[in-house]
Amino acid sequence: MSTAVVPPGWPRQVRPPGAPGWEHTAVAWLLDLCPPEYRSYPAIRRHVVVLARFAVLHVEASQAAVRRGLSEARSELRDVAGLDVVEAAIETWLTEDARLSGVRRAVGLVEEALRGRRFVARL
């Protein structure tokens, strides 16, 4: 019997592919990433690969929003907040950008696994 392998970046909340109940943990995690309204859409709830695709696109949209926030922060916020607040907002966006990069990798790995990919240990 082979041991389940997960690559770096695999979400700790999701059991390894092939482990008992792994898809249930994947669905729960993916739904937590998405807007709450997604839980009420039967097409997404019944088809885990579709849910994974929705989650990927949602995370990518969040990344785009963060990048836009970063690019516009100084010009858009300078008239409504002090320099210290603007700099704090930029730091927050940078932190969120880093977090979302990891989430994007994780959600992509889960999507690949739901599509049938199995990961192999490499030396």
Residue ranges and their predicted role:
Residues 17-123:
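Eukaryotic low-complexity, intrinsically disordered regulatory segments enriched in serine, proline
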